[in-house]
Amino acid sequence: MITLDRLNRKEAIRYLGGAGISLNYRMDVLMDECEKEILKTAEPRFLYVERKAPFDDILLGNDIKKHLEGCHTAVMMCATIGSEIDKLIRISQISDMARAVVLDSFASVAVEQVCQKVDEILAEKYSGKYMTFRFSPGYGDYPIEMQKEYLRILDAPRKIGLTTGDSCLLVPSKSCLLYTSDAADEE
């Protein structure tokens, strides 16, 4: 189980387009309130599945082929902070758009921090192996439509409530689906 105790405020400010600026008192208070709301509301969940080579069923596009070239095992992973976050942001969009934007930035930080914690879990599990960077459907020439297949393989709709619609966007929106790393032998 993953828990989030604090969120990276500098990263949230960067998502807001304010990297390197000083916040005024009102914005500082709003940031504090929104961080607390996200931490209280977030329900971090994740799944991963190991896939052994060959990866023919997921190799649509040249970029993913290059990414997994030489790999013996790859890890398909998804993470979410839950649907209540989407509701919280939508409600704020009606009454206080500034708050909604700050909530959205902290929610993005939260799902990224969940992914980083999963990366740490996998790095420990695959100690002594070379781990590549994350690669998601929609990167380069890798079709975003692959998200539906990923969700099916992971059984994510049933296990953690992560789905996609016809547009292939993830629901809840503050979620991530990717080949997080491979476990090729250390070189």
Regions found by a protein language model. Name each.
Residues 71-134:
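Conserved mixed alpha/beta catalytic, RNA-binding, or beta-rich assembly cores of soluble enzyme
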Residues 1-99:
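Active-site helix-to-loop segments that bind/position phosphate- or nucleotide-bearing substrates
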Residues 130-152:
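Short, structured protein-protein interaction patches enriched in aromatics and acidic/basic residues
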Residues 176:
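TRNA-recognition modules of translation machinery and tRNA-sensing kinases, especially anticodon-binding
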Residues 23-30, 103-106, 110, 114, ...:
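Catalytic cores of large soluble enzymes that bind and process phosphate-bearing ligands
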